[in-house]
């Protein structure tokens, strides 16, 4: 099966003579539901354990007064001469008491995700990076990008200096997305601002390489720009926030290696026992399939249109004659002939006269 060709661009932004076939992973089904499920589970695996102190709320001496004083049985601080004496303690409803069900560090922090499900979500996220509408909907500034997916020469992997790397990104049209990241830096709302998460900013392009010859260090200090190896692509980077459509810049070597990593119709995947997911139907034009002669010859002609009554008022057939006749047509004949009021005729034979005379004489 022939696949579309993708042009390779040089570090100066010019299109080269090289053209690569679109890898098969870009034709994988895009499943936002699977991506969201896997992302929410995988995103929990990097959490650090936290808990309140086991002594919190219990660092005081308190004892219940018991019954007979017309007050609650909650433990109360002893002593006198201060406002604290006599106040409730320990309980979660008390000021200065412990919380209800204090958090423990031995909570189950990690979530297990099926291996094949994670691969399905990653393949969907990769396929979504080639859909321009999804990339734009995610908020990336790709109006000046010559082509999506964007493939750059392998020379990008050998860049050592940040200045040269930024110049290469500007040359291929990613400058607008870099400016968007710089302008988006804001102070975080909430308590995270004093927990080493003081600032928030948007995500920029993701640069995918095949071999690190200096590109990682060159781009690690550019705001919003992330790097990833093509052999270990991460769903957290391909779809941040479980939102499909990350702007990805591929190097030529990494783009060529996608078929080796994920497999295709002719090349087996390097993942053991893995088959790339495919669509249930190969043609997306369902109208053309339904109206084809093969389908139309096998289906029955359409019947009369039926309209379902949304609300039916139930009527008592014992009081409503029309409803009674609709349910029981024989009721009309039954009423007209007055079959319910006729007396049954006795068909028994009269005794003989000799028998009657005999009874009288006796």
UniProtKB/Swiss-Prot annotation:
C-terminal-extended nuclear localization signal as annotated region, ranges: 277-362
Cysteine pairings via disulfide bonds: none
Effect of substituting residue 95 to E: Leads to a slower growth at higher temperatures but allows RPL4 assembly into the 60S subunit
SUPFAM superfamilies given in the database record: Ribosomal protein L4
One GO process term, biological-process aspect: cytoplasmic translation
Keyword Nucleus set for record: yes
Keywords for this protein: Acetylation, Cytoplasm, Methylation, Nucleus, Ribonucleoprotein, Ribosomal protein, RNA-binding
Effect of residue 332 to E: Leads to an inefficient release from ACL4 with a delayed assembly into the 60S subunit
Function: Component of the ribosome, a large ribonucleoprotein complex responsible for the synthesis of proteins in the cell. The small ribosomal subunit (SSU) binds messenger RNAs (mRNAs) and translates the encoded message by selecting cognate aminoacyl-transfer RNA (tRNA) molecules. The large subunit (LSU) contains the ribosomal catalytic site termed the peptidyl transferase center (PTC), which catalyzes the formation of peptide bonds, thereby polymerizing the amino acids delivered by tRNAs into a polypeptide chain.
PANTHER family assigned to the protein according to its UniProt record, in alphabetical order: 60S RIBOSOMAL PROTEIN L4
Domain notes: The eukaryote-specific C-terminal extension harbors a nuclear import signal and delivers the ACL4-uL4/RPL4 complex to the pre-ribosome, triggering uL4 release from ACL4 and incorporation into the 60S ribosomal subunit.
Other comment: There are 2 genes for uL4 in yeast.
Name listed for the protein in its UniProt record: Large ribosomal subunit protein uL4A
Originating species: Saccharomyces cerevisiae (strain ATCC 204508 / S288c)
Gene that encodes the chain: RPL4A
